[in-house]
Amino acid sequence: MTPGLISILVPCYNQGIYLKETIQSALASSYRPLEILIINDGSTDNSLQLAQELETQHPEVRVLDQANAGVTKARNAGIAATQGEYLLPLDGDDLISPDYILQGLAILATRPEVKVVYCQAEKFSNSGRKPWKLKPFSLQQLAKDNMIFVSALFRKVDAEAVGGFSEDMQLGREDWEFWIKLLKNGGEVVQLPLVGFYYRLTPTSKRKKTGGTAFKKARIAYLNAKHADFFERELNGPLRIQRTWSKPYNTLLKFFGKL
């Protein structure tokens, strides 16, 4: 591990059309030392070729090539291969601002009690951009829904301590489950006031694919099975389909002796 080094993990599956722009936004960071690890997850477009070209052009860029295994395994492969003290996942079509890492690591490097630093964000597409309105962080709010996008800053040692991203989480929102296991036993979270992350909206965005009722039910069942202790502590019982009603509903059931 190289002290002070930030490793940007860029899993990429058929995102060649956006990959160069994503890497350019990472290279434009005002923070150094920096490495960018592109994990090609079995792409069938020109992503691997583009990644290798970027690798030859920029000493900060390295490429891993693997058979298609999904984003969680791609991120974990990146974590295992990185040299950085700090990590920042960045999907192959999203962007970051030049000062995001610099401001975030100013906090992580000096405040050991802080586990995660993120920022304000915007969603964008060809038709324009708009603020991504996120609720303030608290553990109880995290139990109901995620407010930390995956492109946050954290320490490699903390990610390794919880086993990285759960590779059996194939239902979307794998970042939510990662933050739960990273933070449920302690650690502070800081949100920077700057807009530092830009989430690209595309017709194939994963959030659109995994937003249906069946996915939601399966996802909630998975989370309850894996983090029952967390939901009991924060919501007085399991997470419900109507997530914001989980705590009052559980409290009512316990009052009547039905939970």
Question: Residue ranges of each PLM-predicted region?
Answer:
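Cell-envelope/extracellular polymer assembly enzymes that use nucleotide-activated donors
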Residues: G4-S7, E35, D175-E177
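Acidic helix N-cap motif at the loop->helix transition within catalytic regions
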Residues: K20, D45-E53, L95, D99
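Short, acidic, metal-binding catalytic loop of nucleotide-sugar glycosyltransferases
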Residues: Q24-P33
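A conserved acidic beta->alpha catalytic loop
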Residues: N40-L50, A69, D91
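Glycine-rich, basic loop-to-helix element that forms the pyrophosphate-binding segment
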Residues: Q66-T82
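Short aromatic/hydrophobic "clamp" motif used to bind/position activated sugar donors
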Residues: L87
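Conserved donor NDP-sugar-binding/catalytic core segment of glycosyltransferases
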Residues: D99-P131
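Conserved nucleotide-sugar donor-binding catalytic segment
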Residues: S138-K216
